[in-house]
Amino acid sequence: MNILSIETSCDETSVAITQDGKKVLSNIVFSQIKDHQMFGGVVPEIASRKHVELITLILEKAFQKACLTPQEIDLVAVTQGPGLVGSLLVGINAANVFAYTYQKPLLGINHLLGHLYAAQIEHQIKPNALILLVSGGHTELLHFKNHDQIEVLGTTLDDALGEVYDKIAKALHLGYPGGPLIDQLAQTGKDTYHLVRPYLKNNNFNFSFSGLKSHLVNLLLKQNIQDLNIPNICASFQASVIDVLLTKTKRVLKKLPIQQLIVTGGVASNSALRKKMKETFLDLEVIFPSVQYCTDQAAMIGIAAFYQKNITPPSYKYDLTALPNLTF
């Protein structure tokens, strides 16, 4: 089965063609980072306009790379949410038009589900897996029982981890996006600031990083940037958030018979997180998608669609709309 998938939930314009829920025939991604850097973050209006400019070209490139024609597509899948409503609508409108033109079935996919299935591209997700999803907009612990039964164990109560990375980087005048910059600087620093480990004095699996963000931003505002050891601040920040992720994950493992741990989402490309997770959970099969599949891209949407098509039947109505606040 050949699946055409489209992802435009934020600031990446991506189109992919995948085969049988495993093989990636093409996965074209255009990142808008340079368009948003001067603003220190994603500007929704700019993002949606850029998607409009690029979507047709990216579609053409995906077919060229896959060496297929539109007639050879069996299913069209598109990110329906969550995300920026203007950005989502560009991808959804493109999917509606393509599917209608070639009379192909159409399926809307949850972006978060896509991140989960990013691991399926190079690995095999097993029943009763624990999923730690860490991205720009979400921090979630999920129990993957099987393809039609995914339970949310813990979620973000305020700021998602990727968002906090960007705000700390902005306070340090490092630039955007903040995640890779902080990760790189932290490699030469030490945990000398011993920052708070937020929201651990409880028995649940939820996350809250707003207190840590406020504490660190206030610390930076009270001191001259030139007097600070930036690598040590980055290392201390990473040590704090990784400790929280490890502690919450351990808490789940004490209650559920998990044999496989999958860490996915944009923050899963962080080198320190990848290293600590693999060092800590030696008795588990710990899986990270390749860095190219951690960030937003359409291949993960196509893989998710292959497994979800029998759970949520595709439609020939071609009237999908955006669901910007979609959850699991």
Curated annotation (Swiss-Prot):
Entry EC no(s): 2.3.1.234
Main location: cytoplasm
Binding, Fe cation: 111, 115, 296
Keyword Repeat: no
UniProt KW keywords: Acyltransferase, Cytoplasm, Iron, Metal-binding, Transferase, tRNA processing
CDD domains assigned: ASKHA_NBD_TsaD_bac
Coiled coil: none
Binding residues annotated for substrate, in chain numbering: 133-137, 166, 179, 183, 270
Record keyword ATP-binding present: no
SUPFAM superfamilies per UniProt: Actin-like ATPase domain
One annotated GO biological process: tRNA threonylcarbamoyladenosine modification
GO-annotated cellular components: cytoplasm
Subcellular location(s) per record: Cytoplasm
UniProt catalytic activity: L-threonylcarbamoyladenylate + adenosine(37) in tRNA = N(6)-L-threonylcarbamoyladenosine(37) in tRNA + AMP + H(+)
Cofactor note: Binds 1 Fe(2+) ion per subunit.
Cofactor: Fe(2+)
HAMAP family: TsaD
Family statement drawn from the similarity comment of this UniProt entry: Belongs to the KAE1 / TsaD family.
NCBIfam families the record matches: gcp_kae1, T6A_TsaD_YgjD
Role description: Required for the formation of a threonylcarbamoyl group on adenosine at position 37 (t(6)A37) in tRNAs that read codons beginning with adenine. Is involved in the transfer of the threonylcarbamoyl moiety of threonylcarbamoyl-AMP (TC-AMP) to the N6 group of A37, together with TsaE and TsaB. TsaD likely plays a direct catalytic role in this reaction.
Protein name according to UniProt: tRNA N6-adenosine threonylcarbamoyltransferase
Source organism of this protein record: Phytoplasma australiense
Source taxonomy: Bacteria, Bacillati, Mycoplasmatota, Mollicutes, Acholeplasmatales
Gene name as annotated: tsaD
